[in-house]
């Protein structure tokens, strides 16, 4: 569970139950990456260990939020959580939400740990991502955390995207990445641009409000958001529905 899965309003018990349910459901067909981030290192270590015990294949660890820390603190925090979990780790850099950025030099230091081998980059700063790629090379797999920057990050050696749009249009996001990997950059760029109206609709309010509404419209029982998140406005509901229809996701 991450941002889109509303992990911030789930209890540990709910989060672990969701991980276990997913592990059992996919039955090794695809890896299960469990969100286990925390701004309390001791709590994060416990959650990392329990997530691994539930059968997760890897952990997605966001930077500490609110209390934050120094770059040296980030190294200590993530190192402790990686060792507590004992399974591969993807770092999650989303300073717009946490108020804390993983500097490229810090990413390089963390990439030396044998279990820390990926980063979800949602800083929106392409120059920073380029520096991470240059400093870390193959030691750190880069994944876009922004749906509107998939192709730019792939062009810098990125391995894919951890996506919001894919919750409603998985084939579109997959095809964009696959086209790039197949060497058809023109098609990849075209599909990246094709995603823009959906991206604008799915971020017309804070994520995951719009995407959960969209999933419910499409017949997926995503339920309601928990407070403090509320339903989208009527105007935004209409915008989301129009974008889904334009993308061919709502069948007449």
Where are these regions (language model features)?
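Active-site beta->alpha loop and helix N-cap motifs at the rims of alpha/beta catalytic domains
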Residues: 1-99
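Short secondary-structure boundary segments
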Residues: 2, 63-64, 123, 146-147, ...
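Short functional linear motifs
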Residues: 15-16, 107, 237
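Surface-exposed amphipathic alpha-helices with a cationic face
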Residues: 20-27, 49-52, 82-83, 111, ...
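Ligand/cofactor pocket segment of small-molecule handling proteins
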Residues: 56-58, 65-159
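Structured C-terminal cap/extension of enzyme domains
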Residues: 148-252
């Amino acid at each position: 569970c991450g941002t889109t899965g509303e992990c911030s309003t789930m209890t540990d018990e709910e989060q672990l139950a969701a991980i276990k349910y997913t592990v059992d459901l996919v039955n090794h067909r695809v890896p299960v990456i469990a969100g286990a981030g925390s701004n309390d290192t001791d709590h994060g270590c416990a959650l990392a260990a329990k997530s691994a015990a539930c059968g997760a294949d890897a952990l997605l660890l966001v930077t500490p939020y609110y209390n934050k820390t120094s770059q040296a603190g980030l190294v200590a925090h993530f190192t402790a959580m990686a060792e507590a979990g004992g399974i591969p780790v993807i770092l999650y850099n989303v300073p717009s939400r946490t108020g804390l950025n993983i500097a490229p030099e810090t990413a390089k230091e963390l990439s030396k740990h044998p279990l820390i081998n990926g980063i979800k980059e949602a800083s929106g700063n392409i120059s920073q991502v380029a520096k991470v790629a240059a400093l870390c090379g193959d030691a750190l797999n880069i994944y876009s955390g922004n749906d509107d920057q998939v192709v730019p990050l792939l062009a810098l050696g990125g391995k894919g995207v951890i996506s919001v749009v894919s919750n409603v249009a998985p084939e579109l996001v997959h095809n964009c990445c696959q086209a790039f990997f197949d060497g058809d950059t023109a098609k990849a760029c075209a599909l990246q641009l094709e995603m823009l109206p959906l991206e604008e609709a799915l971020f017309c309010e804070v994520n995951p409000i719009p995407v959960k509404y969209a999933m419910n419209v499409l017949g997926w029982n995503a339920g309601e958001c928990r407070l403090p998140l509320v339903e989208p406005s009527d105007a935004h509901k209409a915008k989301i529905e129009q974008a889904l229809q334009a993308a061919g996701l709502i069948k007449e």
